[in-house]
Amino acid sequence: MSRLDDIPSSPGKFKMEKSSYLHRLRFQSSLTKFAFFSFFLLCLISLLFLRSPPSINPSSPSDPSRRSLRTNTYGGPAWEKRLRSSARIRTSTNNGITVLVTGAAGFVGTHVSAALKRRGDGVIGLDNFNDYYDPSLKRARRALLERSGIFIVEGDINDVELLRKLFKIVSFTHVMHLAAQAGVRYAMENPSSYVHSNIAGFVNLLEICKSVNPQPAIVWASSSSVYGLNTKVPFSEKDKTDQPASLYAATKKAGEEIAHTYNHIYGLSLTGLRFFTVYGPWGRPDMAYFFFTKDILKGKSISIFESANHGTVARDFTYIDDIVKGCLAALDTAEKSTGSGGKKRGPAQLRVFNLGNTSPVPVSDLVRILERQLKVKAKKNLIKMPRNGDVPFTHANISLAQRELGYKPTTDLQTGLKKFVRWYLSYYSGDKKAAAR
């Protein structure tokens, strides 16, 4: 018998014993009422469920903002041991850094993480493995990194508790922030995912960084899309960026303004990198060079955009290895943040750089190179560029990055696509070992 049963209903007073028959009647009546109300409640819940519209349309891609905060298991001695091992600096020099790479299972994140590890830096990856594109490709990238001793934590930049835990266990000197909702056209289908990842996620990360001691220096991925509807080329960091052509571009522009705010108020050292059409092995399936390759091999027709009056659409295609060199140079030249305890103690570094190839190539030329590499003739369909956020021309002025980062791209499109095609054929033929080379 529970000790609670010994306590009288009115302490200090005599409790009159009730008739057992009356007790049974009331008990049966209570059961009847309970059954009735349970049935009523069940019917009400069923009705509400049937009348509620589905939160995600099954015929369209699911919302990454809903997927990314799913519960993941983290914590515990074994988990913390893996973190510390991955974060350990293994270089003989005294200038090694410890970096948190967000979006580490993404295209650029994978290559940057691997390059940092190769030179002996400590690296922890963070990725939510959402299904904006095939998650199996992201997991293959993770397997590649883990063979090099890099631990990729499965989690989201909007998970504040996870971020706090990571910074509590590891004293990061730098953050390489590459996590984002990518893609210009997808923003028309799922706009909320861009605000969730590219704005809210960035703010969450900066909030954690400003509160830790010491504060890390932060390098983050902006985008060439911030130049929007500018017609003056090549694009320079001094040009206006107040006419974004897509929601994606607007969120990246917002990120630059947010960075300025946190630099000004909290003394965070921040460097933004405006990437220009990155391509190469382990790339993103939503990029034109990638799905062109897939469709050409399958004998499907590919659509090539034309700008107004049958004008040429061209991109400043930049090979992944050149982008990685720029990222590492930005990390190496980043000055320390000046804040402490969430308060600014002095002026802090704030920079933005273009990372491009400086040689725009018409998309039609890209297709011709792919045809030669694949030894397959493409079925081409020329169509007018839709108003979906794409712009007809991109061209980077990289003089600032050359001067301050020593940035010098060396890979032309033909050489880069040859490497991509070799990787693509190896990976999708099932030869993962050859693809990893």
UniProtKB/Swiss-Prot annotation:
The protein's Enzyme Commission number: 5.1.3.6
Any one GO molecular function term: UDP-glucuronate 4-epimerase activity
Location(s), subcellular: Golgi apparatus, Golgi stack membrane
Cellular component GO terms held in the UniProt record: Golgi cisterna membrane
Protein known as: UDP-glucuronate 4-epimerase 4
Transmembrane intervals: 30-50, 96-116
Catalytic residues, chain numbering: Y248 (proton acceptor)
Main location: Golgi
pH dependence: Optimum pH is 7.5. Active from pH 6.8 to 8.2.
Keyword Cytoplasm: no
Pfam families assigned to the protein according to its UniProt record, in alphabetical order: Epimerase (PF01370)
Domain of life of the native organism: Eukaryota
S-S pairs: none
Sequence segments annotated as region (Disordered): 56-76
Tissue: In roots, leaves, siliques, flowers, pollen and stems.
Temperature dependence per UniProt: Active between 20 and 55 degrees Celsius.
The reaction(s) this protein catalyses: UDP-alpha-D-glucuronate = UDP-alpha-D-galacturonate
UniProt note on regulation of activity: Activated by glycerol, not effected by dimethyl sulfoxide and inhibited by high concentration of monovalent salts, UDP-xylose, UDP-arabinose or UDP.
Membrane topology: Multi-pass membrane protein
Subunit structure of this chain's protein: Homodimer.
Function (record text): Involved in the synthesis of the negatively charged monosaccharide that forms the backbone of pectic cell wall components.
Binding positions for NAD(+) per the UniProt entry: 98-129
Keywords: Carbohydrate metabolism, Golgi apparatus, Isomerase, Membrane, NAD, Transmembrane, Transmembrane helix
Family: Belongs to the NAD(P)-dependent epimerase/dehydratase family.
